[in-house]
Structures are given as structure tokens and as C-alpha cells.
Amino acid sequence: MQKKHTQYPHTTIPLAAGSGGAASDELIREIFLPHLGRFFVSEGEDAGVFSAGDSAKDFAISTDSFVISPIFFNGGDIGKLSICGSSNDVAMMGAKPEFITLGFMIEEGLGQDELEKIIKSIACEVERTDLKILSADTKVLPKGSIDKLFINTTCIGKVLKSGISSKALQKGDKIILSAPIGAHGASIFASREGIGLHSNLQSDCAQLYEMLEPLFGGDFEIHAMRDATRGGLSAVLNEWANASKAQIEIDEECIYIDEEVRGVCEILGLEAYMLANEGVCALSVEPSQASEICEILRSHPLGRYASIIGEVTEVSSTHKASSNQNLAKDTKARVVLKNKWGSKRFMEYPQGELLPRIC
């Protein structure tokens, strides 16, 4: 009799499984990995790293699909988002984004002006970092089959800084945050029909490679790096803790949150740590280099608020890094949040679905 691989507790896939938090991890761990895990080159990372022929360099590749609602938002649109999101996933592996593919799934009836505006936005972002389009595809589906427009991308880039991995955290590492958190998620909340919030808040949607390029060319020990998209900062830190069997301690006062983001969070009862970002990354770095790395990030407009927000206080010496392990079952794998009065609480792995169709 064939062994049953899955312990997935649902008979149908819940919306929360697309959140980038615990439910997403559960779906991947219980449905995908039992069947596909042995084929993955780079399990648990936003991009896989591979060698190509006789090239002296490795390459990073990432695929992503963008389904945001609304498709136009303060600070960008689905076109800009698709390039920035895919480019950033490759950059998080220490690579320079160089090539991209694009797949468009268009709902019948989408306005010509709307589509052209999105394509112009894509062209602007592609030109910004000199990306080359390798291939593209277009499908038009009957009205009601999808919501306006979905975009799939695959980005490829040459690795300039090797060894970056969520499994590579070391005891004593300093955790750096490149920018204020929550702007993308809060701005999408504010723009959704029915919520009725009026705000000047803009999404932080941006390509991060230009800010990170000096770090890739220098002699810096970057152990882990991740852009804080779905699930926000909380998801990134908990994924790192899980993968490296580490305890991470974060100083709440060091995390910069814009007042408008705080306002949206207070009105809706949200934690800014769990809101999506599209122009923010976290780094785990050699402690002696942390201050210099922060200064380099601050020299770029996207990193002007970069700061050290915490450190890795413990790493299990016997950990076997695998995203197939359950964070909740490992007491050493945790993220601790300290407030200004010295009290501590866990920064929980995001549960449920805060906001569907966020990116």
C-alpha cells in the first residue's frame, strides 16, 4: 500500500493559503513538497541558484504571478509591481537581474487605455535597470474568468554575491531593515472599495538592486536577505528562524513605521509587521560590518531609513535546515520582539489572510 504523504487538514484550499504566512507554509509543506520537494534546487528561497554550462558564475531565477486588486494603486500599478517583485526576488540572492519573461492573462473587456498604461509602466521599469525581455505571452479569457489582468514573470540574473540563504544565519548576526514597513499593504487597504479610508499613503513598490549593488561588489558577509512581501517582516523573520533553527530578537523601537501606516493599522486592528511591502528588504549580516552596511544603504534614497533592528541570539548547532520542518514544533526557532519597557513577546508567524490579492 502506498504511504499517504499528506496531513493537510483541509479538503479544499482556503484563501489564507495565499497569504505568505503559516497557511502558505502549510500548503507547501503538506501538498507540494511531498511530491516535488526532491526536485527543488533551492527549497525555501525566493529564487533558485543554478550553474549554466562553462560559466564561472551562477545564475538566480525566480518565477512569480501578480494578481493585485485594484490593478492601479497609489504609487504604482500591476505592471510596475510585476517587474519590481520579480527583479527583487533575484536580487535577494545576490544577483543582478538581467532577463525577464512576461505572461499576460487578460479579461475580455479590459480597457485599451488601461492595458496600455500598464505596458508603459512595465517599459519604464525594464528600462530603469536595463532588463531584457526574453519571451512574452498573451492570453485573453472570457469575461468573469479572471479579474481584469494577471501577470506572470520569470526573472534571471547573474549571481554576484554567493552564499546568501535563509539557512545561513549565524549567532551574533545583526538584522538590518532597509526602509519603513507596511506602506504597500496599508495603501492597498486604504484604496479598496468599501473600506472608505482617505490617505495620501503610497506603495513603496520599487526595484532594490541599485541600492544593493555596492554590497554585492564589496567584501561584505551577507548571510541572508529577503524582501518583505506577503506576510511582511514577520513572515521573513519567522522563515529565517525556521530554516536556520535560530532565535532572533528584534528591538521594536528600531523598526521605522510611518505615521499614516500606524493610523491605518490602528483603525483596522492590524500589526504593521505583517503588512506586505514591495520596496523593503531585511538582511542578516556579520555584526562587525553592520554599521558600514547601513551607511551604504542610507546613501541611496530607497535605504535612507536603513537601521539595525535586532540580532540572531541563538542558532542550533545541530540544525538540519529545511523548510519542510514545522516552525511551531521547534522551540529554538522563534522571533522575539522587545518593546521600549523591556517586555518581550513573540513576533508570530502571520495567520489567516489579512488582505487577499495584495501582490
Language-model region placement:
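Helix N-cap motif at beta-to-alpha junctions
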Residues: V285-A290
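Short Gly/Ser/Thr- and Asp/Glu-enriched loop/turn motifs at secondary-structure junctions
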Residues: E43-E45, L275-V280
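Glycine-rich phosphate/pyrophosphate-binding loop regions near the starts of catalytic domains
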Residues: P14, A22-L177, A183, I188, ...
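Short amphipathic alpha-helices in soluble, non-transmembrane regions
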Residues: E292-L302
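Short, ordered loop/turn segments at secondary-structure junctions
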Residues: G18, S65, M105, D137-K139, ...
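N-terminal amphipathic/basic leader segments beginning at the initiator methionine
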Residues: M1-I31, D330-K332, M347-L355
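Active-site-proximal betaalpha loop/short-helix elements
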Residues: G20, E107-G109, L201-N277
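Acidic, Ser/Thr/Pro-rich beta/coil linker or hinge segments at domain junctions
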Residues: H300-C359
